[in-house]
Amino acid sequence: IGQTLVQLLSPFQCKINFFDVRNFQIDELDNFCLKNHIDIKNINQKSMNDVLVESDIISIHLPLNDETEDMINAEVLSKLKPSAVIVNTARGGIVAEEDLANFLRTHDDSFAAFDVFKEEPVINNNLFNLIS
């Protein structure tokens, strides 16, 4: 999914910083870029901390497991830019939803887009109270 997102964003010449637990070799990135007609100068593998601190948009593409449950929590959110956009189309449970609601309440320029939640169907969720 992350690679598809890169392909979709490439015509816009976006600077794409990504974090992956796997360290990609430069030739792997080069081959991916050549195959998909993407300028390799726009793609950078960085530490998770650097991605959080530097990015305008955080798009989450992770499996849900013991290591990733509530991975995006208050501590992680505190590293984001005040105007950060958070997109979660991966799995509910990766983002600590109450922590995100608190972050959004205190950062008027930020927003979040989700198509997954920890508990579905969604009956009562503090994130819905933030819709404006």
Residue ranges and their predicted role:
Residues 83-132:
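Rossmann-like dinucleotide-binding domain for NAD(H)/NADP(H)
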Residues 1-82:
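Rossmann-like dinucleotide/phosphate-binding beta-alpha-beta segment
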